[in-house]
Design a protein with these regions (language model features):
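Intrinsically disordered, low-complexity terminal tails
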Residues: 2-19, 28-30, 451-467
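Short acidic (Asp/Glu) and glycine-rich catalytic loops that position anionic groups and cofactors
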Residues: 16-18, 32-37, 395-397
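Conserved beta-strand/loop scaffold segments within soluble protein domains that form the structured core
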Residues: 131-133, 137-426, 440-468
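N-terminal amphipathic, basic helical "cap/leader" segment at the start of enzyme domains
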Residues: 2-6, 10, 25-172, 176-177, ...
Length: 468
């Protein structure tokens, strides 16, 4: 008798199509000063960035790998190429993108999404942006959406220097230092005061090269009273050797501004996803995170929000799916500094076939954060006896004038729920599928429509195998 599985694995057929390697330049594997200097020269960095990279490398060499997360013994930096330049330069015209790269993004739906519902798109292939464009009416509002290299060396150089790796500093942890040394690609966004961008901007990151790392840097500044929704998508084909994604996201939400940052990460199961994301929110500002984590062999992913301003707020909504061979360590952190700040975390995790899902929440309420409110809700669903789900909450409350709550539920599909639905005419397969679908619904409804559809495609709510 076949073992019954209630939820299929992520359907990766479109993501696992590999392009032939046609790189213009691939740096040798490993990490030392000569490699960092070559990357800096290849990118024609200003002097301050050259020095920043080398200082970050020094910090990287001094720091140890974090010992509290899942093991990453299979990741050997001696085998990782930290820079791979595709055989094209960035363009604002889709017709000028090489056919092989264009076909990859066409399969992933990037051009269609842009035509239908996006204000602008950036598409990164390996270490560089190959396409970046923003609608004329959005640019006419003064919105800046460009690649990081252009911002670093062009009109916005001073702004980049002011904000770059000021939220995520190289000495925060070893992989932040690694990012500072070898970063490449990513997007720069600036929304002027009072401007509301009615439709989202999107960046998509595709890592095609085997044995390579991707280190994109996203820097977004939403000025006073402005509003933006930014979407991030990630994928890679599967190889028999390790790949690495150690990106960095820095978000600055000014007074009374609002930023929603939505992510679907669908890395392959040979990927080590060691991404760092952080937001700083000023008076009256709102930061909203929506996160779906479905791929990678190992993930360390804990978006952090600093509620610096009075009456600033944060919401985090996330879902994690851990299948066979996956150890996904995810969560969120919030630091309350301003008065009357509020935060809410609502997460779901699904694990099957021995997959391991861990949710870490950290709530820090400083003495200055009078009348702060925070609520954390995490629910986990294990679909078999081989899987594992852990919840690790940390609360550091330094004032008596705060309202803090935490709720965690870990369980399996109950026979009673299945029996009830079957008594209403559903088959056992449909009953179990409906329960899992409802479990994920709170997150999927927060995603943009096209990403909600993608998430439902990734988690195939179907039964397979025999019954009884």
């Amino acid at each position: 008798m076949k073992e019954r599985t209630y939820v299929d694995d992520v359907d990766r057929s479109v993501y696992d199509i590999k392009d032939e390697e046609n790189d213009a330049y691939r740096i040798k594997s490993g990490l030392d000063a000569s490699i960092v200097e070559k990357i800096s020269k290849e990118k024609n960095d200003p002097v301050w960035m050259q020095n920043f990279r080398l200082q970050s490398l020094q910090i990287y060499n001094e720091l140890k790998v974090p010992n509290w997360g899942p093991p990453i013994d299979g990741l050997n930096m001696d085998n990782i190429a930290t820079y791979v330049r595709p055989n094209t330069r960035m363009t604002a015209k889709w017709s000028e993108v090489p056919e092989d790269i264009k076909n990859t993004f066409e399969r992933l739906g990037i051009p269609q999404a842009e035509r239908k519902s996006l204000a602008g798109v950036g598409a990164q292939y390996d270490s560089e942006l190959v396409y970046h464009n923003v609608r004329e009416e959005v640019a006419a509002q003064g919105v800046v959406y460009t690649d990081m290299e252009s911002a670093l060396k062009g009109e916005y150089a001073d702004m980049v220097k002011k904000y770059f790796m000021k939220l995520v500093r190289p000495n925060d942890h070893k992989f932040a230092a690694l990012h500072g040394a070898v970063w490449s690609g990513g997007s720069f966004v600036y929304v002027p005061p009072g401007v509301s961008v009615e439709i989202p901007l999107q960046s998509y990151f595709r890592l095609n090269a085997p044995g390579a790392g991707q280190f994109a840097h996203t820097l977004i500044i939403v000025d006073e009273g402005a509003d933006l929704h930014f979407i991030e998508g990630c994928s890679a084909p599967k190889y028999n050797i390790a790949n690495l994604h150690a990106g960095c996201v820095e978000l600055f939400v000014k007074k009374n501004a609002r930023l929603r940052y939505s992510t679907i990460e669908n890395w392959s199961k040979n990927m080590y996803n060691l991404n760092t994301k952080r937001a700083l929110v000023e008076d009256g500002g709102t930061m909203e995170w929506v996160s779906g984590s479905f791929g990678s062999h190992v993930s360390y992913l804990y978006p952090m929000t600093i509620l610096k301003g009075d009456r600033s707020r944060m919401e985090f909504t996330g879902i994690t799916f851990a299948g066979k061979g996956q150890n996904l360590d995810t969560g969120a952190k919030v630091v309350h500094i301003g008065k009357e700040t509020s935060s809410f975390m609502n997460t779901r995790s699904i694990s099957k076939d021995g997959g391991i899902s861990t949710f870490r929440s950290s709530v820090v309420v400083n003495k200055s954060a009078e009348n702060a409110k925070s609520a954390v809700s995490c629910q986990s669903l294990m679909l078999d006896s081989k899987s594992r789900s852990d919840t690790i909450p940390v609360m550091d409350i330094r004032t008596p004038h705060a309202d803090i709550g935490h709720e965690a539920k870990i369980g399996r599909i109950s026979d009673e729920a299945v029996f009830y639905l079957m008594s209403r005419g559903l088959s056992e397969e449909d009953a179990r599928a409906m329960i899992v679908s409802g479990f994920a619904d709170n997150v999927s409804k927060e995603l943009p429509l096209e990403y909600a559809v993608e998430m439902n495609n990734l988690i195939q709510l179907e039964m397979k195998g025999s019954i009884g």
